[in-house]
Swiss-Prot record:
The lineage of its organism: Bacteria, Bacillati, Bacillota, Bacilli, Bacillales. Catalyzes the ATP-dependent phosphorylation of thiamine to thiamine pyrophosphate. Is involved in thiamine salvage. Pathway: Cofactor biosynthesis; thiamine diphosphate biosynthesis; thiamine diphosphate from thiamine: step 1/1. It catalyses: thiamine + ATP = thiamine diphosphate + AMP + H(+). This is Thiamine pyrophosphokinase. SUPFAM superfamilies: Thiamin pyrophosphokinase, catalytic domain, Thiamin pyrophosphokinase, substrate-binding domain. Coiled coil: none annotated. It is an enzyme of class 2 (transferase). GO terms for biological process: thiamine diphosphate biosynthetic process; thiamine metabolic process. Keywords: ATP-binding, Kinase, Nucleotide-binding, Transferase.
Length: 214
């Protein structure tokens, strides 16, 4: 499975051990200060993106020396650094894109990063946002299998569209059958699987799933 992992410049204390997310099929991309986070973890990114306005001159020289390819942008532009890096990753058509370093900083950036998940829905490429407490994904209509993860026991479903039609949860502590939920609903916050596996399905809308721990 081809994986592209992107590390943005969020607080390092919220980023999990990155060495647990790599294998011979994984490409790593650094975004702005996230490139320094990668180098500190002993991982050399294949590409680095950003205006690099949040790093020191010493860190910039370190990135220039280590990264095989550097994409430098003006601070004033029409896309965020992460958005530009994600577009590059999507063009490579991987099986999955995992993004780290996207929580714990500015709320406007975080909400913008949540919206970037929609690019995965449009291109049929799985995108997952990851920090130490949360895994966040976005889904189009369909039926999906889900495995229990004791490290991320809580599972929440949040509408990203005005309506979610015929939402069904099977194998959950709080099951649903063909339920209609609307934007702003908190009905599906903090559910749990009661078996090793479960399923969720819906007929119309766009749904965010968050798997989390305290």
């Amino acid at each position: 499975m081809k994986t592209i992992n992107i590390v943005a410049g969020g607080p390092k204390n919220l980023i999990p051990d990155l060495t647990g997310y790599t294998d011979e099929h994984t490409l790593w991309i650094g975004v702005d200060k996230g490139t320094v986070t990668l180098l500190d973890a002993g991982i050399i990114p294949v590409e680095a993106f950003g205006d690099f306005d949040s790093i020191t001159e010493q860190e910039r020289r370190r990135i220039e020396k280590a990264a095989p390819a550097l994409h430098v942008y003006q601070a004033e532009k029409d896309q965020t650094d992460l958005d530009l890096a994600l577009d590059w990753a999507l063009e490579k058509q991987p099986d999955i894109i995992q993004i780290f370093g996207i929580t714990g900083g500015r709320a406007d950036h975080f909400l913008g990063n949540i919206q970037l998940l929609y690019k995965g829905v449009k291109t049929n490429i799985k995108i997952r946002l990851i920090d130490k407490q949360n895994h966040i994904q976005m889904f189009p209509p369909g039926e999906y299998d889900i495995e229990k993860d004791e490290n991320k026991r809580y599972i929440s479903f949040i509408p990203f569209s005005e309506d979610i039609h015929e939402l069904t949860l099977t194998g959950f502590k709080y099951p649903l059958n063909n339920c209609h939920i609307t934007l702003g609903s908190t009905l599906c916050i903090s559910n749990e699987l009661i078996h090793s596996r479960g399923t969720f399905s819906f007929a119309k809308g766009i749904l965010i799933m968050i798997r989390s721990t305290d």
